[in-house]
C-alpha cells in the first residue's frame, strides 16, 4: 500500500470529512414497484444530501434479474443506472446515507440477489490521489463484483469511459442489457 492509498483510506474509513470534494460513483437499481420512478427519485434524494451534488448521470438500462435461489420464480427485470457525485462525506457516512434511502423505499434483504425496491452501491470513491481502497465489515470499495456486471459497467462507461476498458465491456457481451431511457 502506498502513502497515497493510506491517505485515501484513513479519512474514508475513519469518518473524517475530506477537506476537498471526493468523487464517488454509485450504482442504482430497482425491480419492484415503479422501478424507473424509484431510481429517478433516488438520484434526486442523493443530490439533496448535505454537501453532495450529482455531477453525471447515465441513461437508465433494463437488465434481467440475477436469481440466487434455485427454483425461485422469475423476478421482474431491473432498471439500473450509475451516477457520479461530488461530496465531502467520508465513504462510511455516504454508505449510511444510501442505506437510509434504501430503507425509505422499503428495501428488505431476505437473501442474496432478492428482488428489491431500491439498491444503492458505492462503486468507487476517488480523491485527488486516486481510488480509495476501503475494506470494513459493511463496505468494500472498489465494489468487489462491479467488474463482472454489465448492468454496472455499461452505465459507468457511459459517464466515465476512462474507467472502463473496451476489453472489460467485451467480456460482458453475453449479459443482456438494454438502454431504455437516455440520461436526463
Question: What do the predicted segments below correspond to?
Answer:
Residues 34-36:
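Short N-terminal binding/cap micro-motifs at the start of the first secondary-structure element
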Residues 28, 57, 81-83, 120-124:
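A structural signal for short, well-ordered beta-strand segments
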